[in-house]
Amino acid sequence: MPFLIELLRITGIVTLCPKYRLDRNSLLLVATKRNYIDVVRYLVKKGVDINFQETIRDNLTPLMIASRFNSHQLVELLLNNGAIINQRSLTCGNTALHLAVKNDNRITVDILLFHGANTNITNNDGFTPLHKAVIYNASIDIIKKLLRYKADVNIRDNEEENTGLTPLDIAMSCNNYEIISLLVSHVIRLDYSTCMSNKTKGFDHNKKLVKDNKRLQRIAIHCLKDIEKMKQVSINSRFTLFDLFVNNNVDLLLRCINKDNRFIVNFDKKLTVFNILYTDFIDTFMSRHVLLNKASKVLEDLFLDNDSNTSSWNNLPNEIKDHIFTYINNDELKIMTGSKT
């Protein structure tokens, strides 16, 4: 009965409100705004256009609306039924991820990233989701998650007077020290990495910002001290802890580290500025360790009946298995093992 009541309510809204047309697309938009999950599910089954953009205000799709209001169950429902995750609104060019970040909706951000949302797509102002996160003072967890999913701190917006502002430029104007510190440490990490992002003009701009600003210089000095601490920790005869951290090489760390990993896991307590990024590195490491064990068990069970076959997964050397897993990211492992996002 609640389903019928909800359907009648939104039908009444669409009928009485002159800004809506009486059709299934309008019903879907209103049902999404009201978080009427059963009604949305019903309309989706009836073949409504799931990527329809409203003709009022910001021209948002149902996915954008659900992301804006943190209706994460609806976000999952829409994505699983064909919603275009990187679709841009006609008015502002925002994507669902822009809107989720702007409203500090952590669960929705996680879901969108898991489903492949582009962290570097720009809106009409040239803002990436990372720009939005800094502008609207999003939680540090969201900013860390964006960086983990390859958000580029060196992309510049459409500001004409300064040939474009990076997220670090904006963070300095917003004066949030925690965000500034995180972005500076990320820029310095990139400088030591093999990432192509450190070959761009935006990266050169960010480096100059750090060099020319005394406050940022102090942060950079602490970063360099943290780097020296990590370089003192040998992982094997070839690599230090910093070598693995700077390129986020959790697979190599998994292969090299012994069973007692408490020293590596708790090393963040020895760091001053890099502690946030290092904690994220270790979180990825720990999560991957669990997922790889689950994935190995899934494959072992799958090939259990074929053990007599020398080409079976179970007969492969561990080195080969490890190499194969390097091509599978954590989100793909979650799908493979049926783990939650």
Swiss-Prot record:
SMART domains on file: ANK (SM00248)
Pfam family, any one: Ank
Segments annotated as ANK repeats: 23-55, 58-87, 92-124, 125-158, 163-195
Keywords per UniProt: ANK repeat, Repeat
Gene3D superfamilies xref list: Ankyrin repeat-containing domain (1.25.40.20)
PROSITE patterns in the record: ANK_REP_REGION, ANK_REPEAT
PANTHER family, sorted: ANKYRIN REPEAT DOMAIN-CONTAINING PROTEIN 39, ANKYRIN REPEAT DOMAIN-CONTAINING PROTEIN 39-RELATED
Protein's name according to its UniProt entry: Putative ankyrin repeat protein FPV031
Organism, as annotated: Fowlpox virus (strain NVSL) (FPV)
Gene that this polypeptide is encoded by: ANK3
